[in-house]
Amino acid sequence: RGGFGPLEQLSAEAKNYIAPLPLNYVRNEGVETYFRSMEMPGAKKEDTEKLAKAQALKDATMGWSIAQNIGSYFVHLNGSFHSANQAGIITYLNRYRPGLKIATVEVVRQEKTDKLDKDVMRKADFYICVPTDMTTTY
């Protein structure tokens, strides 16, 4: 509710569990569009921005945690929301560990699985294409 400011009031121990503060926020239009599309009754533009900033803190924290634990190879599994279009976690990971070789994989659901639809191209480095009637877990 209070943006990033109240995070500074967390105890030193609590701050160990999040990305370093102050967080250099990077706008993610995809995230903002997603939150706007939720059409929450009575929501204001500031509410969407706060939700996007909360999401950025999550992504930055995941990026920071990965950066602190990288060995020769590191696999991190997350929903595409956190890494589509090289944004989200990737943005912050590149800040915390510049020069890393990062590859993203996205699962795509389509009617026809023999060829990727053009609208999904460039969202990830690799794709796993599954039929639309495949069981989901969300």
Predicted segment positions?
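C-terminal regions of proteins
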Residues: 61-64, 69-75, 82-138
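Short catalytic/ligand-gating loop segments at beta-alpha or beta-beta junctions
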Residues: 55-57, 78-81
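A substrate-binding/cap region within the structured catalytic cores of diverse enzymes
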Residues: 1-69
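N-terminal start-of-chain detector that recognizes signal peptides
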Residues: 47-48, 75-78
